[in-house]
């Protein structure tokens, strides 16, 4: 008898970004470290995600046909997993009913009590606004709530928080998610480059304007494009970062990088505002008029206020300790053994 087998079911691409699939891989890394066999089942994941999965010893299975419904779940079941971990808002009731009909144990990663699941063995909400009352309809499920369970990729965890460096100009990273759905990278980079900073611009693997962004950055003297293979190191080496308000918020907090978090989707509102209250990010609604001007002003104010920046660094390191993925893995193992351990 081989090791237990967990299947991560999550999608990523230009329309929905890469947050769901990347944080699912962080869960997978935690389970691999505990001796599990892990695979990712996805529909249309970009090559960069598949490389990340391979580097983490996580296999990949392509889901064909319509994603998120009963037919999708039937394909999942044929892989014979011991546990399915589902992350995404498009998985409907027929998807979960199919899993239940096959008596397939499943857990869900959720943000705002939007999951359509009815009988998960475990629910993970890694956001600081998460409360047990949001999941009262799952009385038998293990609940993992809050930043104690923040999912950090191994590449980030292995770098760890660094010491601040004295620089002539502060280094600023711009990283608006895997796909930049509101097309903010170019406008924000142009505004931020007007400040006396060393600007680094990340281009997400699902960003459809990658070549245009690269060409624009080449025209700016104090800007350069980030090598995607060194993204985690670039984030860790940054003095400040302007980022999409998704899971990168937790990575930057752990690494001690003060951030300006741009809300680019409705499902980020509650989590990013709670993070703002926690003190390690300054949130801006990227859907509002002229977010690039607001981001430039916020960045300028942060650079000019070292006491505030230091407080944000301390708040981030206090809030995210880097052990979330392992805690989630241990809790999943316990839930499969029938021993709920709510956190």
Language model features: what each stretch is:
Residues 161, 166-238:
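Donor-nucleotide binding loops and adjacent catalytic segments primarily
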Residues 236-247:
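Acidic donor-binding loop of glycosyltransferase active sites
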Residues 8-9, 13-15, 25-36, 41-138:
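Active-site and donor-binding regions of nucleotide-sugar-utilizing enzymes
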Residues 321-343:
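C-terminal alpha-helical cap of glycosyltransferases
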Residues 308-322:
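A short, well-ordered alpha-helix in the C-terminal region of glycosyltransferases
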Residues 117-182, 204, 208-211:
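A nucleotide-sugar donor-handling region in carbohydrate enzymes
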Residues 42, 241-243, 258-267:
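Short hydrophobic beta-strand element within catalytic cores of glycosyltransferases
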